[in-house]
Regions:
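Macrodomain-like recognition of ADP-ribose-binding/processing modules
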Residues: 1-140
Length: 140
């Protein structure tokens, strides 16, 4: 949660980053280094394809989609297959009573900045699983 949209959301919603770290600790062998970065053990872990749901308020949940293990400006780190797997998990989660009927929002170019993904591919995956979703782009 040190960059991009995750960083902005963590600043806006106190408790998100702590809940995220607890989720990772419970679901994958990892440690945070003294500077707050995940160690290499996590980067080879099995978080790909999972989601972490955080209740920000009564009618807003934030879903962390684990579609990449690392960031790089030189090569693609995002996994389209892992994103599809996570979306399938999210699709099932959205059937729960507390989540039914809530609007869905996805950040524009999700997985494309530090993850190196292709937005045309990502937007097609989003539209396939969640055609009713709104893509949000912050003004620059």
């Amino acid at each position: 949660m040190g960059g991009g949209i995750a960083y902005a959301l963590a600043r806006k919603f106190p408790g998100l980053e702590k809940a995220y770290r607890v989720f990772i600790k419970e679901n994958c062998a990892y440690e945070y280094s003294n500077d707050g970065w995940l160690t290499k053990e996590y980067k080879t872990g099995s978080m790909l394809g999972k989601i972490h749901l955080f209740k920000a308020c009564d009618d807003l949940y934030i879903a962390n989609v684990f579609g990449q293990n690392d960031v790089s400006s030189r090569s693609r780190q995002t996994s389209y297959d892992a994103t599809v797997e996570a979306f399938e998990v999210m699709e099932k989660a959205l059937q729960e009573e507390a989540l039914k009927g809530l609007p869905l929002y996805f950040p524009y170019k999700m997985g494309c900045g530090l993850g190196g993904g292709n937005w045309q591919i990502y937007s097609a995956i989003i539209n396939l699983y969640f055609p009713e979703a709104t893509i949000c782009q912050l003004p620059t």
